[in-house]
């Protein structure tokens, strides 16, 4: 096709775009988002991927008078031979044309059905970050100060009142008994009295009583809806804990022996979803699966999570349960340090072939990994990878594992992925048994948006799982959008150092286990004392 003819087709597509928008606005049933829901925050966040250029008027430069969407004309699908269809991954232009028919610009809206108003575009402009520096030296100094601020925030010690504690344990006898023992200790022997260094901080919080009353009224209304026959006992703001245990444990004898009973309540998944701000902290007892369950229960806001291990320490459950009295006493009185672990926000987009658009079926937050595999199919699957709407490659394998830094020591390392410290915000992509020997795991920054598409000419469907939960089938044309979640997982750690992660790496995975060349414990303790004395000086 000549360049002149292609330009005319683009102009024709731009002219007919507004007419298609007007027709689609009258058909509310085919829109890719709910008009009754306020989509402005979502549009403001996701519209940066659109190809838009504006022509502001001389009078109002902040408002856009005309918007033009630049897009390639819809391509016509040409029949291809069976060999070319199976080896279409080498034709990047064909993949780009195919993605033009199935890609979207906003997670809850399709490009052909998006009506962008001047106010929303102006809001998008105002959210941009502008930095001014007189020279390169000032810019370097600014970057250094930002890194120093991030380092201090990661090492900051927090201290606030804990009153309502949610307990999560594994479904085994030892974990349940340990959880009940910990709950009884909190109810009987522990009384929260903040130290003098934290009295000023606690007294300066004038909104604490208001927030308590709001959360109590929220919980009261929820309990009346879910448990209409139960008598609601209001919470009195004293130095006593209110313990929430799982409702499935209510009939056990060890749970019925807890006292006082007015401070023992039971939680459900609905309560965690609808009232996430009700709980001050979450305590998990068991292994790493208990901490993953806490992340799955709180899809948005997550309270600080303390993870105790009943057996061998894991990468999430690093606190030994045998020392829970000492650990909790230090945390509640002297404060604690939180490691904000990155989570993914995964959006499932269903392809509507009748209207050549997509609809968002659901969103899930994952702490470990998103797994896409071939499921029960006996042959490998084809997946198209796009980063920021740019075609990267077509992967032919048994599946792909998209992991967070926290999940780099789980399924990802078994798939050949790299180990990544949880303090590094990154997206790890590892193929599962790839057909091409040249495919290597890749690490992307968390600022990018990854899209994994099941091609329209794929041989079979794919299956996906989110942290081992909620297994879903992906049809032809469907895809998943992966981006960094706005709600990280706050994991309570004992110190600001990364000593725990490296110790567990050596203990659990036997990382670089060559005993003849490892330093002795005496040498390591001497180095630790030297570093501590240097910091104190």
UniProtKB/Swiss-Prot annotation:
Modified residues (Phosphoserine): 72
Ranges annotated as biased composition (Basic and acidic residues): 88-98
Name this polypeptide is given: Uncharacterized kinase C1B1.02c
SUPFAM superfamilies recorded: NAD kinase/diacylglycerol kinase-like
Stretches the record annotates as Disordered: 1-33, 71-98, 197-220, 516-537
Family affiliation: Belongs to the NAD kinase family.
CC terms in the record's Gene Ontology section: cytosol
Biased composition (Basic residues): 516-529
Lineage: superkingdom: Eukaryota
Pfam families tied to this protein: NAD_kinase, NAD_kinase_C
Organism of origin: Schizosaccharomyces pombe (strain 972 / ATCC 24843) (Fission yeast)
Gene Ontology molecular function: NAD+ kinase activity
Keyword Kinase part of the UniProt annotation: yes
Keywords recorded for this protein, A-Z: Kinase, NAD, NADP, Phosphoprotein, Transferase
UniProt-listed Enzyme Commission number(s): 2.7.1.-
GO biological process, one term: NADP biosynthetic process
Amino acid composition bias (Polar residues), ranges on this chain: 197-214
């Amino acid at each position: 096709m000549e360049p002149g003819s292609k330009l005319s087709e683009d102009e024709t597509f731009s002219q007919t775009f507004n007419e298609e928008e007007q027709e689609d606005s009258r058909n509310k049933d085919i829109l890719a988002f709910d008009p009754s829901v306020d989509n402005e925050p979502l549009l403001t966040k996701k519209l940066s991927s659109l190809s838009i250029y504006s022509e502001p008027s001389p009078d109002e430069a902040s408002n856009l008078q005309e918007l033009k969407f630049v897009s390639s004309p819809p391509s016509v699908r040409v029949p291809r031979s069976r060999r070319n269809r199976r080896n279409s991954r080498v034709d990047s232009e064909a993949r780009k044309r195919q993605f033009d028919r199935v890609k979207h610009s906003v997670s809850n809206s399709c490009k052909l059905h998006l009506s962008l108003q001047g106010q929303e575009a102006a809001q998008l402009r105002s959210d941009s970050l502008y930095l001014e520096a007189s020279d390169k030296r000032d810019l370097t100094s600014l970057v250094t100060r930002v890194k120093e601020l991030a380092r201090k925030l990661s090492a900051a010690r927090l201290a606030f009142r804990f009153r309502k504690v949610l307990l999560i344990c594994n479904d085994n006898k030892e974990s349940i008994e340990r959880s009940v023992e910990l709950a009884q200790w909190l109810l009987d022997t522990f009384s929260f009295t903040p130290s003098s260094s934290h009295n000023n901080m606690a007294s300066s919080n004038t909104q604490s009583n208001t927030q308590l009353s709001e959360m109590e009224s929220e919980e009261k209304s929820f309990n009346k809806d879910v448990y209409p026959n139960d008598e609601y006992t209001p919470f009195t703001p004293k130095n006593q804990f209110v313990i929430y245990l799982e409702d499935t444990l209510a009939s056990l004898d060890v749970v019925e022996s807890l006292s006082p009973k007015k401070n023992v309540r039971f939680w459900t998944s609905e309560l965690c979803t609808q009232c996430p701000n009700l709980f001050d902290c979450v305590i998990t007892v068991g292994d790493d699966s208990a901490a993953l369950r806490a992340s799955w229960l709180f899809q948005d806001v997550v309270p600080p999570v303390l993870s105790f291990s009943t057996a061998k320490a894991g990468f999430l459950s690093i606190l030994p349960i045998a020392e829970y009295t000492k650990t909790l006493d230090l945390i509640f009185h002297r404060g604690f340090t939180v490691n904000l672990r990155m989570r993914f926000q995964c959006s499932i987009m269903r392809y509507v072939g009748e209207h050549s658009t997509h609809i968002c079926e659901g969103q899930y937050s994952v702490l470990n990994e998103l797994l896409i595999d071939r499921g029960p199919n006996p042959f490998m699957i084809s997946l198209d990878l796009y980063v920021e709407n740019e075609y990267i490659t077509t992967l032919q394998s048994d599946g792909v594992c998209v992991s967070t830094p926290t999940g780099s020591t789980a399924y990802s390392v078994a798939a050949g992925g790299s180990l990544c410290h949880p303090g590094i915000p990154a997206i790890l992509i590892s193929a599962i048994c790839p057909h091409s020997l040249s495919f290597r795991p890749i690490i992307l920054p968390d600022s990018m948006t990854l899209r994994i598409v099941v091609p329209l000419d794929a041989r079979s469907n794919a299956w996906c799982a989110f942290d081992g939960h909620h297994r879903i089938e992906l049809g032809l044309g469907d895809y998943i959008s992966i981006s960094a979640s706005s709600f990280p997982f706050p994991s309570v750690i004992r110190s600001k150092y990364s000593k725990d992660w490296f110790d567990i790496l050596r203990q659990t995975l036997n990382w670089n286990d060559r005993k003849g060349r490892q330093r002795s414990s005496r040498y390591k303790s001497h180095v630790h004392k030297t570093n501590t004395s240097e910091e104190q000086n």
